[in-house]
A protein has these predicted regions:
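Nucleotidyltransferase catalytic core that binds NTPs
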Residues: 1-122
């Protein structure tokens, strides 16, 4: 874990993860588990992107796919899932009130490829 920007949060918020999640896979689960294992609640934001070769599923289909795997954590109130408009950048200023954290996965997780999954190669 690498903290890219330090905030002054009170620890009561959610760890937010933004992605296309096309498809949801164990690398994504590893990432979410990093926050859950620290006792944080998680907000999964699904980008509402146009359907194409890299994004074959609608945001609703993605939400249902993730919900099916994480239903117990959702019911416990540890995870929330929302759909957000597509974004092109995440911008911060000083005194942002929250940390910006990069999680660096181990090699076997980092090698998981949604593209290869979509192509049926793994």
């Amino acid at each position: 874990m690498k903290i890219l920007a330090k905030g002054n949060g009170n620890g009561n918020g959610h760890a937010m993860f933004i992605g296309r999640w096309q498809p949801w896979h164990k690398g994504h689960r590893w990432l979410i588990d990093q926050a859950l294992n620290e006792g944080k609640k998680v907000l999964i934001c699904i980008r509402d992107v146009e359907a194409d070769e890299k994004n074959p599923w609608s945001p609703i289909e993605v939400m249902l796919n993730i919900t099916n795997e994480l239903i117990e954590l959702i019911e416990e109130g540890r995870i929330k899932i929302i759909i957000i408009p597509d974004i092109e950048s995440v911008n911060i200023g000083r005194g942002i009130g929250y940390d910006v954290i990069e999680h660096v996965p181990p090699q076997e997780i980092g090698e998981i490829s949604a593209t290869k999954i979509r192509e049926g190669k793994i």
